[in-house]
A protein has these predicted regions:
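Solvent-exposed loop/turn segments at secondary-structure junctions
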Residues: 215-218, 256-260, 314-318, 334-336, ...
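Active-site recognition of the HExxH zinc-binding catalytic motif
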Residues: 337-354
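Active-site-proximal segments of metallohydrolase catalytic domains
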Residues: 247-323
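Bacterial Sec-dependent N-terminal signal peptides
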Residues: 1-47
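Short pre-active-site segment immediately N-terminal to the catalytic Zn-binding motif
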Residues: 223, 320-341
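Beta-strand-enriched, solvent-exposed domains that form extended recognition/catalytic surfaces
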Residues: 50-178
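Fold-level signature of zinc-dependent metallopeptidase catalytic domains
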Residues: 175-239, 252-262
């Protein structure tokens, strides 16, 4: 074989190799696509086997004191369309302080799991709860079952022990389940993460976030819609939300109030508003919250939603966030953006407060129990938290670095030092309102102070994980 034939042979062999590699890559991609499609289809089939594409609303009252919890069923209603997840239905991403489980009545098989926390359970940590019984109402949306189901409500204490439980049966054909046909209030989408061919938002592939007007009169509704756009801009200006914006829909719900602004009890000001929010919750001036979840869900009847932000028409600092319950924030305070993002971290991803006091009334995170919040640890089971993110040879507890006092920052260089502290992962003592025995993952974070821009890496991962969970198109962790 001469040199020319040799070069021709090598070139032919090389081309065959390239073609074979390309073919193998194509087969691999087709196989992966087929597996993804089968998993997505399997998820849809699992949902369709047990549920219809509608919503069942369940209303309860939770009552008790600092050591007792009871749950009482009130009523049920149903609405067209289901805005929640259709995959990973029986999985529990976070334990929360309570769990709602739907099980098939005939077989006992778990069909759907929803975890949550409530204002009632926060109240149990107050001094008032040691001397009086109180009741709070809650509502839950679940997919409408095709057949008879058992509903199990479980309430846990600070040790994770079950202290309250209710089980009852729901028959979807029950004539006393009220059918809600149309939305009761005007609403407008201010952001659509994904749209269908008809231009409507895709409520199956996206997380549906409802912003409800509170303390806005009829003449202030255009201000409300403008404020809602500010909410969208503020929330998605922060990572990891910026990168996940296409996985959210945001709908503005124009709930009209007779009076402008919320109630302020310590000033003797009581208003007539759509949701009934007020400052001074649990006698804390800044704690702005509503006690009436039934009323809030009534306003949202017929509107697809999974998470709620109550936007309060006020320039006074305040707000609150409770896991899988609601976020409350004010519209016009100078720190509106920071408060919104912090409180939404609580409500959406179950992130705990990373600040602490030396005189906390109640130990909410006892040493013998690992917190369920992903960004707090008592070291009881640190391996389940951010141990995998800890740099090698990091001491536990991690000594804090010398950084500027966030209350005295004046220069850009000092602000950069503070923000840099959010990205150093360690095990810093102090968190969950307790100065001792509870540890947080970063020296500073959006869940600790308002003066930094970023979530720490541990909180960011938690936000991404919960978003992946809600928007998953298949039924596997992998």
């Amino acid at each position: 074989m001469d040199s020319r034939d040799s070069r021709k042979y090598c070139l032919t062999l090389h081309m065959k190799t390239i073609i074979n590699v390309k073919w193998r890559m194509k087969k691999l991609l087709l196989t992966l696509l087929a597996v993804w499609c089968m998993r997505a289809t399997a998820g849809a089939q699992a949902f369709d086997e047990h549920f219809v594409d509608s919503t069942l609303r369940l209303d309860y009252v939770l009552a008790g004191n600092n050591h007792e919890q009871q749950a009482y069923f009130c009523k049920a209603s149903k609405m067209s369309r289901w805005a929640g997840r259709k995959n990973r239905l029986a999985e529990m991403p976070l334990k929360g302080n309570g769990q709602l489980i739907l099980s098939d009545h005939a077989t006992g098989r778990q069909l759907y799991v929803h975890t949550f926390s409530t204002l009632f359970q926060e109240w149990q940590a107050t001094e008032e709860a040691t001397r009086v019984n109180r009741a709070f109402n809650v509502s839950f949306n679940v997919p409408l079952p095709k057949h008879l189901v058992d509903v199990n409500i479980t309430l846990t204490d600070f040790h994770g022990k079950v202290v309250g439980q209710l089980q009852h049966t729901v028959n979807p054909a029950d004539i006393l389940i009220r059918q809600v046909k149309e939305p009761q209030l005007p609403f407008r989408y201010v952001w659509k993460g994904q749209v269908q061919s008809d231009g409507e938002p895709d409520i199956t592939r996206c997380i549906d976030l409802a912003i409800v007007a509170e303390g806005y009169t009829d003449s202030q509704m255009e201000k409300f819609y403008t404020d809602c756009q500010r909410v969208v801009d503020a929330l998605f200006a922060h990572e990891p939300f910026t990168s996940m914006k296409s996985r959210f829909n945001v709908v503005a719900v124009a709930a009209e109030s007779a009076d402008s602004g919320p109630s302020i009890p310590h000033l003797g000001r009581w208003q007539s508003t759509a949701v009934g929010t007020h400052y001074d919750t649990f006698y804390s001036n800044r704690y702005l919250m509503t006690h009436d979840m039934h009323r809030l869900y009534d306003l949202l009847a017929g509107i697809p939603f999974e998470h709620i932000i109550v936007l309060v028409n006020s320039d006074i600092y305040g707000g609150g966030g409770i896991y899988n319950h609601l976020t409350v924030t004010t519209s016009d305070h100078p720190m509106f953006r920071q408060v919104l993002v912090h409180e939404f971290g609580h409500a959406y991803a179950g992130l705990g407060d990373e600040y602490f006091y030396d005189d906390s009334y109640e130990t909410m995170y006892p040493a013998d129990t690992e917190p369920w919040e992903p960004n707090l640890t008592t070291l009881k089971d640190f391996g389940s938290k951010w141990a995998d993110m800890l740099p090698k040879d990091t001491p536990i507890p991690t000594p804090p670095a010398k950084i500027p006092d966030y209350r005295k920052v004046k220069t850009e260089a000092e602000r950069q030092q503070l923000n840099a502290a959010t990205q150093r992962v360690g095990v810093f003592e102090g968190g969950g309102y307790q100065s001792k025995g509870v540890y947080r993952p970063a020296q500073e974070c959006r869940m600790k102070i308002n003066e930094v821009e970023n979530f720490c890496p541990v909180c960011s991962r938690a936000l991404v994980r919960i978003t992946d969970f809600y928007t998953s198109q298949h039924n596997s962790h992998k």
